[in-house]
Each structure stands twice: as C-alpha cells, then as structure tokens.
Amino acid sequence: MRMTSSMAALCVLLLAQPLLAQGWTEYENRVDRFTVPAPGEPKVETITWDSEYGAKFPGRVYRWEQGRTRYSVTVVDYSDAERIHSELGHIAYQGGPGYWTIDIMASIDYAAMLYRQKPGVKVTYDAWHYIERVTGHELQLTNSDDSRSYVGIYLHENRLYVLDATAARNEAPPIIFQQSFGFLDAEGKPVQYRDFYFNRLPPPRLKRP
C-alpha cells in the first residue's frame, strides 16, 4: 500500500517529537541555503569535490554524531561549472561547451553511483525521490559492518545536496533527518514550490571562439 502525503506528514511529526526531547534543534545555514533538524551544531569541513568529468568543485560537509548514529550534509557548488571546466585544459573539454552542463545534470546520478560502488555495500532501496518538491534520488544501504545508511541526493539552484544518516545495527532508522530537510532561497526564506522543481542550468557566460 502506498503511503499518502498526509500519512507521511503524520509519521514525520510523530518521529520528530522524541527528537526534540533529545535536544535536537532546527539547524539553518544561509550560506549553503538549507535547514535540517539535527543534534546541535555541526562540525564543518571544507572539501574539494571531484566530479564525474574530472572537474574539482568547492563544497562543505556538515557532520553530526549522536550515540552510534552519524549524520552529514554535503553541499557542492556547481554554479561556476562553466569556468571550472574551461580551465581543465584537457582536449576533451576544449571548445566543448556541453561538458560543464552534463557535469551538473549528471551530478545526482554520479553521487548515487559512488554510494553503490562502496566496498561491501548492499543496496536495499534505490529510487527517484523528492523533498519539498525538489526532485532527487533516495538510497538505502546495508554497509559492510551491518550499519544502515539512508541517503538523499538533490540538486537545487546548481548546488548538490547529499544527505547521509548512518545508524549502527539494531538502531532505529534515522529517517527524520532526510524527510525534514528544507531548502532556503537567497534571502534565507524557505522555498515553496507548487509544482515539482527540476534544476535549471546557469546561463553561459564565457565567449566561444
């Protein structure tokens, strides 16, 4: 039986109540434009994300831990993809304006592939998904140590968001972390879409010969 949207909302609400009692708060980040319920302030790491087509994009990882459960949000900024690809110098990218756009459009699938290819991982759920009407992909995996990972991957305003909640064996599924994730606009306000959102590519800026 498929769960209706009202039933799903009720489940999220019921799951959120004990988390609030455990000291969870709504973490808001206006730099990377997201909000998520989390156990306190995260540890933040600046990263370089290696893309499918050999480009390096700036990003940050936000990490939390509570007991034997780990949570993270990875945000990768693809908005400057055209310039980054133009500086690669590889013959495959010279004069080829399509590669930077492909790198953005394929970013969700590529991130999902990285999870599927982890050593010892068994994928138990692998399907299209959306949160706040922003389209993406959902994965559930059993890891080599029998822990369980619940992963959501979304692309919004040319930022890639990878949500990962990993719980040890026999721990409760930490699905509230993903299901209550939200996106913010440039002014820090929650985005609300009436229709499903599909990422729009940034306009080309570089002159072509």
Residue positions per predicted region:
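Short, solvent-exposed coil/turn segments at beta-strand boundaries
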Residues: P37-E41, Q66-R70, V134, Y154-Y161, ...
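Bacterial N-terminal signal peptides that target proteins for export
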Residues: M1-A8
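N-terminal signal peptide c-region/cleavage motif recognized by signal peptidases
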Residues: A16-P18
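N-terminal targeting signals for Sec/Tat export/insertion, comprising classic cleavable signal peptides
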Residues: R30-A55
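Surface-exposed amphipathic alpha-helical segments
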Residues: R30, P42, A92-G96, W100-T101, ...
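Solvent-exposed coil/turn segments that connect beta secondary-structure elements
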Residues: D32, G67, Y78, S144-D146, ...
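Conserved polar/disulfide-associated segments of primarily extracytoplasmic proteins
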Residues: D50-R148
